[in-house]
Amino acid sequence: MARLKVGIVFGGSSEEHAVSVKSAQEVARNLDTEKYQPFFVGITKDGAWRLCDGPGQDWENGDCRPVVLSPDRSVHGLLVLEQGQYRSVRLDVVLPVLHGTLGEDGATQGLLELSGIPYVGCDVQSSALCMDKSLAYVVARSAGIATPDFWTVTGDETIDPGRLTYPVFVKPARSGSSFGVSKVCRPEDLATAVESARRYDTKVLIEAAVVGSEVGCAILGNDPDLIVGEVDRIALSHGFFRIHQEEQPENGSENSTPVVPADIPTEKRSLVQETAKAVYRALGCRGLSRVDMFLKEDGEVVLNEVNTLPGMTSYSRYPRMMAAAGLPLSEVIDRTLSLALTGKLR
């Protein structure tokens, strides 16, 4: 039986480029190459697309050829430039391993919709919705899901610091990981935090701090057939959780440790999982996502954010939560590809 041709797209021009490369390395290690034939498409930080041998740390200096993903449905794949001529490579499915702007905000998904190639993960609408935390909060609230109190600042707008109750978190509304995020405890520090967030997005989100534990839940599937991973909890020694901000995240964080399974009572774990599924459905997610939440002392679960293409590195939360539930990364990859092709969990 012929192997299915899988385009694995990684890298990208967002601030999460390096994390994407590491995620792609883990995907490459865990892909069943007896079943799938991978075509690795790396996107440089400058936005150039290259067909390469694999997502090694020095992949750009290897045997790379210029490539584009054709929006022409008759091509159904890649156009590779070789010796001054383009040749086409028909793909059966695409697995985006991209994080942040232009990777999980609906842009890449729109190109894939034009191409007609099935792809892993959320569609254009849900990708864009989840990327904009303020819009995700609006939709979640309409579905009866608790969110932090929040305000948005766009363009040259300002906000009266005296309106807020501190502490607050200031963050780019449409950015991944913890880039540009600040905890503000005094009104006089608000303007600086807003300017820091504007380095990453023209729309800034200001959230009232939620007192509680940070918890997460990995989800795999299409509604109504969903698999939920074990819940995790972020154990903090001080400060706040800054994912992917360390120079060597493989060696752990200086202030946080993910605990999987979360050391919380069974009934609270179940509530977190049910809330995560409600968020997933309300925001129209499909394929996979990681839902991050807060668990308050009174038992209320509050939405933090949704990652539609969560990290797949050796230290990432999503694969750890799924592994704790009995699904190794190789199985997760296989099931997401099956979902993209058939719409059903096998």
Swiss-Prot record:
Q: Where does Mg(2+) 2 bind?
A: E305, N307
Enzyme class comes to: ligase
Please state the span of the N-terminal signal peptide per the UniProt entry.
none
The record's misc note reads:
S.coelicolor was found to be of intermediate resistance to vancomycin although it does not produce vancomycin.
The UniProt record lists the keyword Membrane: yes
Q: Which UniProt keywords apply?
A: Antibiotic resistance, ATP-binding, Cell membrane, Cell shape, Cell wall biogenesis/degradation, Ligase, Magnesium, Manganese, Membrane, Metal-binding, Nucleotide-binding, Peptidoglycan synthesis
Cofactor(s), names only, from the UniProt record = Mg(2+); Mn(2+)
Would you identify the family this protein belongs to, as annotated?
A: Belongs to the D-alanine--D-alanine ligase family.
Q: Which InterPro entries match?
A: ATP-grasp, ATP_grasp_subdomain_1, D-Ala_lig_Van_CS, D_ala_D_ala, Dala_Dala_lig_C, Dala_Dala_lig_N, PreATP-grasp_dom_sf
Please list the residues that bind Mg(2+) 1.
D292, E305
Subcellular location(s) of the protein: Cell membrane
Tell me where on the tree of life, at the top rank, the source sits.
Bacteria
The EC number(s) attached to this protein equal 6.3.2.-
In this chain, ATP is annotated as bound at: 163-216
Q: Which GO terms describe its biological process?
A: cell wall organization; peptidoglycan biosynthetic process; regulation of cell shape; response to antibiotic
KW Nucleus (keyword) present: no
**What is the protein name stated in its UniProt record?**
Putative D-alanine--D-lactate ligase
Q: Which Gene3D superfamilies match?
A: 3.40.50.20, ATP-grasp fold, A domain, ATP-grasp fold, B domain
